[in-house]
Amino acid sequence: MTSLTLPDIAAQSAQQPLPLDWVGMCGIAMPVQFEGRQLSALADAGVSLDDGASRGIHMSRLYLALEALERDTLTPRLIHQVLEQFLFSHEGLSASAHLRLQFDHLLKRPALVSPLAGWKHYPVAIDARLKAEMFHVELSVEIPYSSTCPCSAALARQLIQERFDQDFTGQAVDRQGVRAWLGSSSGIVATPHSQRSMAKLQVRLVGDELPVTVLIDKAEAALGTAVQTAVKRADEQAFALANGQNLMFCEDAARRLNLALRQLDWVAGFTVRVEHAESLHAHDAVAVSRFQR
C-alpha cells in the first residue's frame, strides 16, 4: 500500500497576512453535566488568530477539547481548563480563547396555593474568555414574569369610582349592596392591562460556582409575579392578587432586579434588561440597568 501524506492546508501561509479577532465554530451540539443532570447544549468555541501570516486555526483541536465538558460537572474551573487547552493547542497562533454554552434549565415550580406543580424552562448562556491569564465568566438567563401597568390600574379604579357614583347617587348605601355591586360585571367596569414580560440578566461571576437556580429564585422573588405552570382557580386568584400588589412599569422592574442582584456576593457586576410586551401598544417597553463593584 502506498503511504500518502495528507495535506494540511491550514498550516500554509496566508496570501493576505492579517490577524483575526475570532475564528472558531458555532452551534456545536453536545451534552453537559449540570446540577446533577445531563443537558443538551450548544457550544460556540473559538480563538483569536494573532499570527496573521497563518492561513487558519485547527478547529478539530477545539472540538476535541470540548470532550472534557461531557465527563465532568460544569464549573468555571472546568471551563477555564478547556480554554487553556484551546490556547495550548494553538500555541504561537492565538492569544485569547472564548467559549459560549447555551442550554435550557428546567425547574419544577409549585403552584401558588394548590398542591399542583409543573416545569418551566429558562434559557441560559455561559460566556467565558481567557486572555493574558485573565479569565472571565458571565452567566445569562431569561426569566418570564407578569407585569400590570400602574397607570392603567389607576385609570381602571377611577372608572369604577365613577360607575359607583352613577349607580348609587341618591341611594342609601349598605354594606351588602356594595359588596354585591363589587362582585358584579356592572360594578367592575374596567380592568388594568397586563402583559407577559421578560427579564434578561447578564451577570459576571466571582468564584467557582454557576448558581443558575439561585439567580432565578432571587430575581423571581424580587419581581413577585413569576409566570405559573399548572394552576387551579385558587392559584389564578392568588396570581391576580400578586399582580395587583406588584404593579410595575418596566423602570420599576429594572430597579427591583438591580437592588436584588447587587446583594449577591458572587456577583462582580451585571446588566439587567427588562422587556414588557405591551398589550396596549404594538411595541415593547424596555429598561436597562447596570452595576459594577
Curated annotation (Swiss-Prot):
EC numbers for this chain: 3.5.4.16
Enzyme class: hydrolase
Alphabetical UniProt keywords: Hydrolase
Domain of life, per lineage: Bacteria
Cross-referenced InterPro entries: GTP_cyclohydrolase_FolE2, GTP_cyclohydrolase_FolE2/MptA
UniProt-listed GO biological process terms: tetrahydrofolate biosynthetic process
Role of this protein: Converts GTP to 7,8-dihydroneopterin triphosphate.
Name of protein: GTP cyclohydrolase FolE2
Organism phylogeny: Bacteria, Pseudomonadati, Pseudomonadota, Gammaproteobacteria, Pseudomonadales
Gene assigned in the entry: folE2
